Regions:
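Conserved polar/disulfide-associated segments of primarily extracytoplasmic proteins
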Residues: 35-148, 155
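N-terminal targeting sequences that direct proteins away from the cytosol to non-cytosolic compartments
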Residues: 1-63, 113, 118-120, 140-144, ...
């Protein structure tokens, strides 16, 4: 079994050899640095009112591997890696993880003051392969937020790639920034 490796950033390119995908962005995007990535777990927990869910986030074996924000300040993408464990890793496939997540995601988003309009299981063509994902439409303070989460499972780890935009039409072009890397 191969060892988990963090993704690398070089110029406008992010690559994660472990999961076999990369992303190339132009200078209208800004990648978060290591300190910003570390602070994201705490910031995510701070948005949540539910103490149990907040504790779960802080205790989870998970981290942000990449985050980038478009110049508009609201369109963004991130890669969160989570250790689902050797036992669960053998049992859980992407489809099951998505189905289980959809059961709790609307409540989790509501705890972060997002009003979920729709949340559906989708197949995503991501970096040259089909993966299970979740397409969510929420509103925040009256504004639309479209999120596409793609699940990429390798061994006992899953990378969840989240694309977020106020315009649903932006999600497909954002997917196009990702490509397969040789592993």
């Amino acid at each position: 079994e191969k060892t988990l490796e963090l993704g690398t950033l070089s110029g406008g390119k992010y690559a994660n050899d472990y999961f076999g995908f990369g992303c190339e962005l132009d200078d209208q995007w800004t990648y978060a640095d290591e300190d910003q990535l570390l602070s994201m777990i705490q910031a995510t927990a701070d948005l949540i009112d539910d103490k149990n869910f907040k504790d779960d986030i802080l205790d989870a074996d998970m981290f942000y591997d990449m985050m980038a924000v478009y110049y508009d300040g609201v369109t963004s993408m991130n890669v969160v890696v989570q250790n689902i464990g050797a036992a669960y890793g053998a049992l859980l496939d992407e489809e099951t993880m998505v189905d289980e997540t959809i059961k709790v995601l609307p409540d989790q988003l509501a705890a972060a003051s997002m009003d979920v309009q729709s949340c559906e299981h989708v197949t995503v063509e991501f970096a040259g392969a089909d993966h299970d994902g979740i397409l969510t439409h929420s509103t925040v303070n009256g504004g639309d937020v479209y999120q596409l989460q793609t699940y990429v499972k390798v061994g006992k780890y899953v990378a969840v790639v989240t694309l977020s935009s106020p315009l649903e039409d932006n999600l497909d072009p954002m997917l196009g920034f990702f490509y397969a890397v040789q592993i």
